[in-house]
Amino acid sequence: MSVAGLIFSNIHNSAIPELTSVRTMASVPYGCRYRLVDFPLSNMVNSGITKIGIITHNNYQSLMDHIGTGKDWDLARRSGGIRILPPFIAAYSNANAAKLYSTRLEALMGVTNFISRCTEEYIVL
């Protein structure tokens, strides 16, 4: 069974604004060594998923610095691997192009290009 993975990097940003004002929730440190994104990434890689996209919203520079090429998860590959998916503002609506997505469905609509290029049979969110 072929599976790709998608991770939302900003799911609970509003829960702790003190920590997420300059970084996304996925890049919040845990245990002084890890970031919160490490856990879903490791779970996906250990389950055999080798193509993973991380949907971002804002303040994702520290996430990009932490992920790097994906070498720590054996995701530095030519095909598959890891992709940072920044918000694509006009992907789903021309009505309000200045507004970023506010729901998960709108975020998924913004990464339809990534989803449509996936040759995998399933996508895990």
Can you say where each PLM-predicted feature lies in the sequence?
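N-terminal glycine-rich phosphate-binding loop and ensuing alpha1 helix
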Residues: M1-I82, A90-A91, L105, R117
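Short aromatic/hydrophobic "clamp" motif used to bind/position activated sugar donors
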Residues: I123-L125
